[in-house]
Design a protein with these regions (language model features):
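Short, small/polar residue-rich loop motifs at catalytic or cofactor-binding pockets
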Residues: 60
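Extracellular/periplasmic catalytic domains that process cell-envelope and extracellular macromolecules
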Residues: 57
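Acidic-and-aromatic substrate-binding clefts and catalytic sites of carbohydrate-active enzymes
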Residues: 41
Length: 172
């Protein structure tokens, strides 16, 4: 199983059923950037965890639980396969607990995930982001991503940020 390397503040582990309460909290949290978004339920969190188990089995990656080195739950971050206009892409995605936002955790976790993707042969990485979600656009830019196009997805526009990746050995 692929797992990103720990960072100076964060660790990654597989998501499991025992994470249901934490995942419900992060997925159902009010998002001031998207106040009209339907808030997810505990049942949604169950399906989310089940989806990660399928991702781990099918792709050897998924969204991983992100914690501080002291074990405090930060959220999730990882890789998923996404169909964008009929083409499969690897996407970096994340959710951060409201009280943990604006502390650089999303960028730190997503950077480790980006580097893990590159080390495991992912050649192109995307992030699908709603136009009004400027904080996530900032994270994508911090990862070296650029706006590639806008697509219609799940009832609204989505910005497709992306970048080419290279293994570290190829950069030398």
């Amino acid at each position: 199983m692929v797992l990103p390397e720990p960072t100076s503040r964060l660790t990654f582990r597989l998501m499991e059923t025992a994470d249901l309460d934490d995942m419900t909290a992060v997925l159902s949290a009010f998002d001031p950037v998207r106040p009209g978004r339907r808030r997810r339920t505990r049942d949604d969190a169950v399906r989310w965890i089940e989806w990660q188990a399928r991702n781990y089995a099918e792709h050897d990656f998924g969204l991983w639980v992100v914690e501080t080195h002291t074990g405090e739950f930060v959220g999730d971050c990882g890789l998923t396969m996404q169909d964008v206009e009929g083409t499969a892409h690897v996407e970096v995605g994340y959710h951060v607990m409201p009280g943990m936002r604006r502390q650089g955790y999303a960028t730190e976790a997503a950077t480790a995930v980006r580097d893990c993707a590159a080390e495991h042969g992912v050649e192109h990485l995307i992030a699908l982001i709603r136009p009004d979600n400027t904080p996530s656009q900032g994270v994508a830019r911090n990862l070296g991503m650029h706006l590639e196009r806008t697509v219609w997805r799940q009832g609204g526009d989505a910005l497709v940020f992306g970048r080419r990746l290279q293994r570290a050995a190829q950069n030398r």
